[in-house]
Amino acid sequence: MENPGASQADHSAKFCQWIRICEWILLALLCAYFGARTLPRAWRTLNTDFPNYYLTARLTHEHYDTSRIYEWMWVQRQKDHYDIDQRIVGMVPITPFSTLVVWPLTSMSALSAKHYWLALNLVLLVVTLALLRSMTHLPWRRVALVAALSFPLQVNFLLGQYYVLLLFILTFSCWLYVRQQQFLAGILVGLASGLKIFPILYLVYFVRKKDLKAILGTVVGCLGIAAISLLVFGWQLNHTYLTQVLPAALRGEALNPYNLKAASLSSLLHRLFLYEPQLNPHPALNAPWLFAVLHPLLQMALIAPALLLVVPKEHCPRRDRLEWAAILLVTLALSTSPASYLFTLLILPVCLIWDALEQQRDRISIAVLMSFYFAVGIIGGSDHGGAGWSALLKVPRLYVLILLCVFTYLLLIRQQPRERLKLSLSWTVALIIATTLSIATNLRHQQGLYADYQWRIFTPHDVYMAAQPVVEDDTILFIAFMLDGYHSAVDHFDTVQFSSPSHNDYLAVASTGSERWVEQVGNTSTVVPVNMDKAGIREAESPVVSFDGRWLAFLREDHGRARIWLHALDQPNNSDRPLTPTVLNVLEMAFLPEGTLIFSAVSESQPRLFSADQSGNIRYLGIDDARYPSVSPDGHWLAYSQLDGGNWNLWLHNQDTGATHRFTHVACNNIEPAWAEDSQTLIYASDCGRALWFTALSRRRIFP
């Protein structure tokens, strides 16, 4: 007679054997796809992201002044000069320190550097999988299968991103932590926070855990990274990151905040409740206060369980791994700029959670976990048809991530001893206070932020940035950042014409009224006349023409530092001559009617306003933290932007009396003023309600 128990065990063994066979087959197919499809494509082309890191590291390696690396047009100019085969580059919101990971590769071409980078990533991936295998009870095939099923990992290799490196660091840190090497684990968390800011949430985890060694290690790691960043890049760039880039990134405004393809909580709430004339003309409800309240409230609703479910002062490897997974999952769910490759990091928490479920032999939960994991990798968001409340249907990845967090929290609750299932009053109060402060900060940030819309000039939908306006009678000339590069543009009564598509970028424009000049950028910058048979000026940037049309001033750069040079338009055979000393790094300039130049230049560590006459006599004007000078045609007024609290606002200086007063008072950037011919109206670039420095043009009458 057949033994029912033996028969059942036999069936179970056969089922497990078939599962193993299927796993090996799937792993082999996925690895074959990676080797035959993904890796060759990554090897042949630069794609979008690797050039950002490579260019910054190379400029630093070659001793350039990199204090302006976050300025889109400045870094685009450097990219063109180095002939890097990538249409658009930009550093926002990348940390300065993260670019140093490719420092050793900057002696070679960009594509060759990417080859070495890909090889290093393959090695790091194998080491990471070995650490995961060591940390869990999962067999090699399952650890490898988790990685092979990661579509974000494929994208990471295609674009040359650094998330395999970040995955390795966080995995190694977790491996050390569960082995009671808390100080070293904390140092690695500090290192990870230098690459991407969100791992700093582990510091809060360590505080909740009351783990002094891990706290100390994280602080030491962060201080070490800060010291290296200051030593390599200097104070100015790091200050720009901390006071301008990072706050915008935390609000979800480092890049287009209304883009539902990001599928982030921030982009969804921006789309639902914040009106913007060009980027979001049809929100579900124009209620900025709702965004200010709901964003921190919903963020805390996700973060709080991950922290409150932590068991303080207790180190159990099984429990620590789950807590580690929960913290990483919630940081990914709350990311304000979650590109697909970010979710390469899911490999770590998914392996840790799978291991916990495998020990419980909970196959249904494993199936749910892997379904969530696969869905996060292949779905994102859609920006098509997301007007009004329909935006709620356009971010499926966000909902799957939230479900994955809830799934992990339930697992933590299930594994937590009953006597531990009680809220920490002090932590609950602290989280409520943090949420309240965040809401108050948001409401304060919004004061007057959207008033600028009433003065906005029409901007075509395909223009991401309109900048550097120049007034010519009833026409506005400006530079337009579009999908295929930077164009010169002409706006005549809301009819906009763009320069023809070209391999070169157009990064500046100037006008005498009868003549127009543009900066055309390829291997070098050349200021060329438009529709005229005059010769261009090589190695020249950012042209400005005097009121009488006799002089053209331009910048000539050497290793990222620029001087003013003068070119005589009425005597073109005369040699161009420098006007400012090398000790000043000139940023922008404007002519006074009599021919004197007012310019902004970095002296010591901050930009200041100076004047220079035709003989080169320099005079400091006593105005600090100031850029973008512009003189009215009647010579009575100087407009400029001054930095205060991380924002550039417009100021007016009376040239006759010396009096100054602030013209705008908002927590955004109003820059690059240009005067209309009546000397009563300003056209300027504003990023209020938009992504950081992705400006639109506004026209505003100054005097009644």
Where are these regions (language model features)?
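Primarily membrane-embedded glycan-assembly and transfer machineries that use lipid-linked glycans
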Residues: 2-184, 209-340
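A cytosolic-side transmembrane-helix exit/cap motif
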Residues: 163-166, 186-189, 236-243, 344-348, ...
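Transmembrane helices and adjacent periplasmic/lumenal helix-loop junctions
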Residues: 189-206, 334-345
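Sequence signature of WD/YWTD-type beta-propeller architectures
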Residues: 423-704
